[in-house]
Amino acid sequence: MNFNKLFALVLLIGLVLLTGQTEAGGLKKLGKKLEGVGKRVFKASEKALPVLTGYKAIGK
């Protein structure tokens, strides 16, 4: 019984590795979108942080 589970797991990992290489374009597009989101969040935080620190200074 354990051999069947191990064989199925190895087969599944092998299929994922083989099919993952053919879809590199899709993964690259996803990575670019995530990179763009990260840049937008970084720029927004650069704008918001001075405002927040000024607000905290007024509150003291």
Swiss-Prot record:
Q: Name one GO cellular component term.
A: extracellular space
In the induction comment, the record states: By bacterial infection.
User: Which Pfam families does the record associate with it?
Assistant: Cecropin
Q: What is this protein called?
A: Cecropin-B type 1
The family annotation for this protein states:
Belongs to the cecropin family.
Name of the gene encoding the protein in the UniProt record: CECB1
Q: Does the keyword Secreted apply?
A: yes
Q: Which InterPro entries match?
A: Cecropin, Cecropin_insect
Q: What is the phylogenetic placement of the source species in the record?
A: Eukaryota, Metazoa, Ecdysozoa, Arthropoda, Hexapoda
> Where, per the database record, does this protein carry Isoleucine amide?
58
Q: Which UniProt keywords apply?
A: Amidation, Antibiotic, Antimicrobial, Immunity, Innate immunity, Secreted, Signal
Where in or outside the cell?
A: Secreted
The leader peptide range reads 1-24
Function as written in the Swiss-Prot or TrEMBL entry: Cecropins have lytic and antibacterial activity against several Gram-positive and Gram-negative bacteria.
Q: Does the keyword Secreted apply?
A: yes
Provide the GO biological process annotations.
Answer: antibacterial humoral response; defense response to Gram-negative bacterium; defense response to Gram-positive bacterium; innate immune response
For this chain, the annotated S-S bridges are: none
